[in-house]
């Protein structure tokens, strides 16, 4: 099997079969990540560029480690220190990187659709590392991989996503991916943080966290997106925590063996209490490990796809 596109721009337009293919490949990569010898030569001779127009710690470092573990040459470009500051356009930046022989460009941008624009104008494969409020596909893939590891399947599971759904690209990618894989998705948050007509993409919307979490197999907290919000969407952080924060008492509404996830960074005492964040049902640290494995899988599959096309075309 091969990925159909040269790019990974989102989970909205990817098939369930492709998602399964990526997750199965990530299982092999997880063995490398957790071994004493993390070096392989799968991507030797390949050039991976991270192009980030927004700050990032987890995602950027995860991709850089994934590249190095696979034997690729990796370079990071920050918008603050690039020719963007001199007025260079996104397309011109992409073409410059392309001309230097890059194989994959990993891009984060504050504007929704920016990775799609880049992908149309470069020969390199483009991976969306988060675009505005649109999608964050690799985060959703690592979330699904973590669930699959702990539950053995995605089909038929009830997943409760709690928090700022409106501004969350993580929520959107998870909704697209989880529903395609047969999971039932519940969402809850302040009415001002729930997108209008979100039910049309296959989720159940609840006004209370208690309803959304009842008998859930997975509870996913979302970070309050303060940097993306206009004022007045909810009274105070304290009020948000009171009505929508997940603590030990509320977690008991979920199934006894429910797992807790969060894309990070966690605002302790807001989305999740410290006891839930550090508790036995929390697999937040495992998500970080799995992020490297999933991104290794993507780098491998996208570069492999190019090699296959060169041979067969």
From Swiss-Prot:
It catalyses: carbamoyl phosphate + L-aspartate = N-carbamoyl-L-aspartate + phosphate + H(+). One of its GO terms (biological process) is 'de novo' UMP biosynthetic process. Keywords: Pyrimidine biosynthesis, Transferase. The keyword Nucleotide-binding does not apply. InterPro entries: Asp/Orn_carbamoyltranf_P-bd, Asp/Orn_carbamoylTrfase, Asp/Orn_carbamoylTrfase_sf, Asp_carbamoyltransf, Asp_carbamoyltransf_Asp/Orn-bd. One of its GO terms (cellular component) is cytosol. One of its GO terms (molecular function) is aspartate carbamoyltransferase activity. It comes from the Bacteria. Pfam families: OTCace, OTCace_N. Carbamoyl phosphate binds at residues 58-59, 108, 136, 139, 264-265. PROSITE patterns: CARBAMOYLTRANSFERASE (PS00097). Its EC number is 2.1.3.2. Pathway: Pyrimidine metabolism; UMP biosynthesis via de novo pathway; (S)-dihydroorotate from bicarbonate: step 2/3. L-aspartate binds at residues 86, 169, 223. Belongs to the aspartate/ornithine carbamoyltransferase superfamily. ATCase family. NCBIfam families: asp_carb_tr, PRK00856.1. Heterododecamer (2C3:3R2) of six catalytic PyrB chains organized as two trimers (C3), and six regulatory PyrI chains organized as three dimers (R2). Catalyzes the condensation of carbamoyl phosphate and aspartate to form carbamoyl aspartate and inorganic phosphate, the committed step in the de novo pyrimidine nucleotide biosynthesis pathway. This is Aspartate carbamoyltransferase catalytic subunit. The gene is pyrB.
């Amino acid at each position: 099997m091969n990925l159909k596109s040269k790019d990974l721009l989102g989970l909205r337009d990817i098939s369930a079969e492709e998602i399964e293919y990526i997750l199965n490949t990530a299982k092999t990569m997880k063995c490398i990540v957790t071994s004493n010898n993390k070096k392989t030569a799968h991507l030797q001779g390949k050039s991976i560029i991270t192009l980030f127009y927004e700050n990032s710690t987890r995602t950027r470092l995860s991709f850089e480690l994934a590249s190095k573990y696979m034997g690729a040459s990796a370079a990071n470009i920050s918008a603050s220190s690039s020719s963007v500051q001199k007025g260079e356009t996104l397309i011109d930046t992409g073409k410059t990187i392309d001309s230097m022989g890059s194989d994959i460009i990993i891009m984060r941008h504050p504007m929704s659709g920016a990775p799609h624009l880049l992908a149309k104008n470069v020969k390199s494969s483009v991976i969306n590392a988060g675009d505005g409020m649109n999608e964050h596909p690799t985060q959703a893939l690592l979330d699904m991989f973590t669930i699959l590891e702990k539950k053995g399947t995605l089909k038929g599971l009830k997943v409760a996503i709690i928090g700022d759904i409106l501004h969350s690209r993580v929520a959107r990618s998870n909704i697209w991916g989880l529903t395609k894989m047969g999971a039932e998705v519940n969402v809850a948050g302040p009415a001002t943080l729930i997108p209008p007509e979100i039910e049309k993409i296959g989720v159940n919307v609840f006004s209370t966290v208690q309803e959304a979490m009842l008998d859930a197999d997975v509870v996913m907290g979302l970070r309050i997106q303060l940097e993306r919000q206009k004022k007045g969407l909810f009274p105070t952080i304290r009020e948000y925590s009171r009505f929508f924060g997940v603590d030990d008492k509320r977690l008991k509404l979920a199934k006894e063996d429910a797992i807790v996830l969060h894309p990070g960074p966690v605002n302790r005492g807001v989305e999740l209490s410290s006891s839930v964040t550090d508790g036995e049902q929390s697999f937040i640290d495992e998500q970080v490990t799995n992020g490297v494995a999933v991104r290794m899988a993507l780098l491998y599959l996208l570069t492999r796809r190019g090699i296959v096309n060169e041979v067969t075309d």
